[in-house]
């Protein structure tokens, strides 16, 4: 698994990026194109699996871009834990009642402030 963090800057109408604590770099005319190039540069250094990336503007002319290669993580949906041992049905039935109590309490708290968030 490889994690590549880039510091990106906009100067003269073009975006450039240098790897934080590394040698990788790239440049492009738009942030979209820069991100695509940085993913390719990262994959050339480590092609061990899937890719995740995150782009965050820090100011209008600077940003941080992170590429994670491998690691097996991926999206937010996972089937792990879907199969459970028997005997948990009683707990599952009790859970909705607790949720209802919490919902009622939160509705009461809204009334204490004199406004309704959802109305």
UniProtKB/Swiss-Prot annotation:
<dbReference type="GO" id="GO:0006414">
    <property type="term" value="P:translational elongation"/>
</dbReference>
<keyword id="KW-0597">Phosphoprotein</keyword>
<feature type="region of interest" description="Disordered">
    <location>
        <begin position="79"/>
        <end position="119"/>
    </location>
</feature>
<dbReference type="Pfam" id="PF00428">
    <property type="entry name" value="Ribosomal_60s"/>
</dbReference>
<keyword id="KW-0689">Ribosomal protein</keyword>
<dbReference type="GO" id="GO:1990904">
    <property type="term" value="C:ribonucleoprotein complex"/>
</dbReference>
<comment type="similarity">
    <text>Belongs to the eukaryotic ribosomal protein P1/P2 family.</text>
</comment>
<protein>
    <recommendedName>
        <fullName>Large ribosomal subunit protein P3z</fullName>
    </recommendedName>
</protein>
<dbReference type="GO" id="GO:0003735">
    <property type="term" value="F:structural constituent of ribosome"/>
</dbReference>
<dbReference type="InterPro" id="IPR027534">
    <property type="entry name" value="Ribosomal_P1/P2"/>
</dbReference>
<comment type="function">
    <text>Plays an important role in the elongation step of protein synthesis.</text>
</comment>
<keyword id="KW-0687">Ribonucleoprotein</keyword>
<feature type="compositionally biased region" description="Gly residues">
    <location>
        <begin position="79"/>
        <end position="90"/>
    </location>
</feature>
<dbReference type="GO" id="GO:0005829">
    <property type="term" value="C:cytosol"/>
</dbReference>
<dbReference type="GO" id="GO:0022626">
    <property type="term" value="C:cytosolic ribosome"/>
</dbReference>
<feature type="compositionally biased region" description="Basic and acidic residues">
    <location>
        <begin position="96"/>
        <end position="105"/>
    </location>
</feature>
<dbReference type="InterPro" id="IPR044252">
    <property type="entry name" value="RPP3"/>
</dbReference>
């Amino acid at each position: 698994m490889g994690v590549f963090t880039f510091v990106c800057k906009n100067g003269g109408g073009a975006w450039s990026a240098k790897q934080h604590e590394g040698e990788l770099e790239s440049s492009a005319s738009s942030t979209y194109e820069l991100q695509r190039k940085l993913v390719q540069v990262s994959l050339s250094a480590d092609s061990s699996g899937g890719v995740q990336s995150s782009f965050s503007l820090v100011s209008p002319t600077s940003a941080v871009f992170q590429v994670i290669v491998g690691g097996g993580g991926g999206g937010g949906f996972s089937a792990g834990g879907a199969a459970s041992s028997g005997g948990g049905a009683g707990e599952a039935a009790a859970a909705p009642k607790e949720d209802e109590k919490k919902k009622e309490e939160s509705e009461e708290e809204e009334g204490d402030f004199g406004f309704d968030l959802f109305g």
